[in-house]
Amino acid sequence: MGLSTVPDLLLPLVLLELLVGIYPSGVIGLVPHLGDREKRDSVCPQGKYIHPQNNSICCTKCHKGTYLYNDCPGPGQDTDCRECESGSFTASENHLRHCLSCSKCRKEMGQVEISSCTVDRDTVCGCRKNQYRHYWSENLFQCFNCSLCLNGTVHLSCQEKQNTVCTCHAGFFLRENECVSCSNCKKSLECTKLCLPQIENVKGTEDSGTTVLLPLVIFFGLCLLSLLFIGLMYRYQRWKSKLYSIVCGKSTPEKEGELEGTTTKPLAPNPSFSPTPGFTPTLGFSPVPSSTFTSSSTYTPGDCPNFAAPRREVAPPYQGADPILATALASDPIPNPLQKWEDSAHKPQSLDTDDPATLYAVVENVPPLRWKEFVRRLGLSDHEIDRLELQNGRCLREAQYSMLATWRRRTPRREATLELLGRVLRDMDLLGCLEDIEEALCGPAALPPAPSLLR
């Protein structure tokens, strides 16, 4: 049994040996040579690439801005490279057969061209100022405006690839990188953590308080303005007479009824006046205009001791004369107070240097608005007027008194008379003021010893 086993093992061995002997070259071809394997697996140095047809040759790569036109013919020989055409580029060393096409900025995504395409660089696209890039993919981006952080503060400034990071004020929450009022917050959103109910209650209380207080403030303001207006109107009625006296140099005209009430007896006829026959004067009418005479009887400085009538309080309004009366006046003119002083038998009265009452009477009866004109006509210069006003800046009355005292000192005593003041007041058309001065100086001596009540 052992002998039969041996022939069975020898048969396969013999067949294997025959196959090796018959096809030695075919078996050797199946396994590559060790040297060829090392060459095929070797890598070319940096800046070169393996020849596509001969692995043993390394060709030099083309520079950026060029492309491979033909491979190098052999080792140590140059590669045939050509420059890219317009609208194409290569951005690095390469052995590409064609240049890459230039990219275009997408206006629908808000992109703008930062730098144009060249043979060695692709088009550079970006965003405008105060914008950032939001990438939808690795190379696709869209431009959005940076958030202004309204109702909040900037935590991180806007960058090229990141929007502004905001921190919202109290009563606002962040939604899509914008600070939105808590009134727009719903219970289902996360904003309920930031918008607390207490804040809403406080805000509601403030709004209700403002709603109540605002109408009250407006109402009381209108009431205050109304009271102020009424007070001014009441004051105006009291100031009206004083203002009229200051501006016009005479009292305000009274109503006709009041004027008739003050007329208690008819006027004494003037001996020098003879009216035209048939002329009948009306009640309260004076043939002499009010700008020249008043309603009082004829008066001269020499008659002061015998003057018993009370001081004039009102002056009748000016009334124009009829044609007949005008003819009578032209034929027989009535003298004015200044003419009566000049025609009087008495000599002109000089101002008493030791008695300041005379100067104060002039100060009180000349209108303040006409005062500077008055003292200029007396001979004072503007420099002297300003100096005396500064010396008595707190009291206008004392300043005016000082001006008259200065005029009196520089004027000879025989010339400082009421006649001179009367001429100046006549030139200023202020004869009414002159009569007031006369009454102020002569009135106290003419009062009766036992005063009687006026009705």
UniProtKB/Swiss-Prot annotation:
Disulfide bonds join C44-C58, C59-C72, C62-C81, C84-C99, C102-C117, C105-C125, C127-C143, C146-C158, C149-C166, C168-C179, C182-C195, C185-C191. PANTHER family: TUMOR NECROSIS FACTOR RECEPTOR SUPERFAMILY MEMBER 1A. This is Tumor necrosis factor receptor superfamily member 1A. One of its GO terms (molecular function) is tumor necrosis factor receptor activity. It is found in: Cell membrane; Golgi apparatus membrane; Secreted. One of its GO terms (cellular component) is Golgi membrane. Receptor for TNFSF2/TNF-alpha and homotrimeric TNFSF1/lymphotoxin-alpha. The adapter molecule FADD recruits caspase-8 to the activated receptor. The resulting death-inducing signaling complex (DISC) performs caspase-8 proteolytic activation which initiates the subsequent cascade of caspases (aspartate-specific cysteine proteases) mediating apoptosis. Contributes to the induction of non-cytocidal TNF effects including anti-viral state and activation of the acid sphingomyelinase. The soluble form is produced from the membrane form by proteolytic processing. It is linked to Periodic fever, familial, autosomal dominant: A hereditary periodic fever syndrome characterized by recurrent fever, abdominal pain, localized tender skin lesions and myalgia. Reactive amyloidosis is the main complication and occurs in 25% of cases. Multiple sclerosis 5: A multifactorial, inflammatory, demyelinating disease of the central nervous system. Sclerotic lesions are characterized by perivascular infiltration of monocytes and lymphocytes and appear as indurated areas in pathologic specimens (sclerosis in plaques). The pathological mechanism is regarded as an autoimmune attack of the myelin sheath, mediated by both cellular and humoral immunity. Clinical manifestations include visual loss, extra-ocular movement disorders, paresthesias, loss of sensation, weakness, dysarthria, spasticity, ataxia and bladder dysfunction. Residues 338-348 are annotated as: N-SMase activation domain (NSD). TNFR-Cys repeats lie at residues 43-82, 83-125, 126-166, 167-196. Its main location: membrane. SUPFAM superfamilies: DEATH domain, TNF receptor-like. Binding of TNF to the extracellular domain leads to homotrimerization. The aggregated death domains provide a novel molecular interface that interacts specifically with the death domain of TRADD. Various TRADD-interacting proteins such as TRAFS, RIPK1 and possibly FADD, are recruited to the complex by their association with TRADD. This complex activates at least two distinct signaling cascades, apoptosis and NF-kappa-B signaling. Interacts with BAG4, BABAM2, FEM1B, GRB2, SQSTM1 and TRPC4AP. Interacts directly with NOL3 (via CARD domain); inhibits TNF-signaling pathway. (Microbial infection) Interacts with mumps virus protein SH; this interaction inhibits downstream NF-kappa-B pathway activation. The domain that induces A-SMASE is probably identical to the death domain. The N-SMASE activation domain (NSD) is both necessary and sufficient for activation of N-SMASE. Both the cytoplasmic membrane-proximal region and the C-terminal region containing the death domain are involved in the interaction with TRPC4AP. Residues 356-441 form the Death domain. Residues 233-455 are cytoplasmic. It is a single-pass type I membrane protein. It comes from Homo sapiens (Human). One of its GO terms (biological process) is regulation of establishment of endothelial barrier. Residues 1-29 form the signal peptide. The chain crosses the membrane at residues 212-232. It comes from the Eukaryota.
